[in-house]
Amino acid sequence: MNSDNRSANILMSAINILLFLGVITVNALANGLPINGITTGELSGLYPNLFVPAGLTFSIWGLIYLLLLLFVANNLYLSIRDKKDVLIPVKAQIAFALTCVFNMGWIFLWHYKLVFLSLLAMLGLLLSLIYLYLKVDELRLTNVWDRVATLLPVSIYFGWISVATIANVTAVLVKLNWGAWGIPEHVWTLIMMIVGAALAILVLLRHKCLLYPLVFIWAYIGIIIKRSAQEVVHKDIIFTAYAAIAVLAVLIVITGMRLRKELQA
């Protein structure tokens, strides 16, 4: 790596640490102040729908932010040490910077009830993460530490934002009082769940990523918990969630066994 690329990587790594700290600060203020006098969870309650999982499911954000802290710190270390074989390229670092900007933007737009604009920010976040994930995947990391510090954070974040995007789309439709072409709400929820599961299967089979579908399993467990606790129990939604979890779990095990054989070959 020439000196210009090395300097660019170090600069972007440092910027990303600052942007990540900004994300943590904004998210803390979102519920600490709270921004616009209402918490993120209370806002979700304004747009009730059957796709939103139980509140405890959102505790995954704590894990995500811990992993992202590891990601940005490790990336700065790799940049300084010029570890070009395991360092994501500058364009991918810029993509991570964009995820931070879109993340913070989403918080403000959501809290000021600009639901449609918040969806645009969420889509920007998702697209940035897709690009970042693809670049990380191209590195073909084999070392355990590199996979934990680079692939794990990006995969989990990508998975959860995929789930969040589906939830955000649903919130926009609720806000617009969209009739869903006459499709009942629970049927629309089933469609969204099937689309989510199909997306998880696609990423699993195409990129052999075991982590991405695990996030969907976590989200669907949250849906089961929330739907089971309601007065009106939607058994079709619960059954679909269980079925999706079972299919994803089986495919994860099969893919994991194949990967193990490939590594041993």
Language-model regions: role of each:
Residues A8, V52-F58, W181-A198, I225-V250:
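Membrane-interface transmembrane-helix boundary segments in multi-pass integral membrane proteins
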Residues A8, Y77-R81, L134-R140, V253-A265:
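Membrane-interface capping segments at transmembrane-helix boundaries
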Residues L18-T25, A95-W106, M122-Y133, T150-N168:
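Alpha-helical transmembrane segments of multi-pass integral membrane proteins
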Residues F20-G37:
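Alpha-helical transmembrane segments of multi-pass membrane proteins
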Residues G45-I60, V148-S155, W178-W188:
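Short aromatic-rich membrane-water interface segments that cap or initiate transmembrane helices
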Residues F71-K83, P89, Q93, A97-L119, ...:
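Internal transmembrane alpha-helix with an interfacial aromatic "cap," most often the third helix
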Residues G105-L119, L176-I183, L204-H207, A229-K235:
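Membrane-interface helix caps and helix-loop-helix hairpins in membrane proteins
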Residues L211-G222:
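Central hydrophobic cores of alpha-helical transmembrane segments
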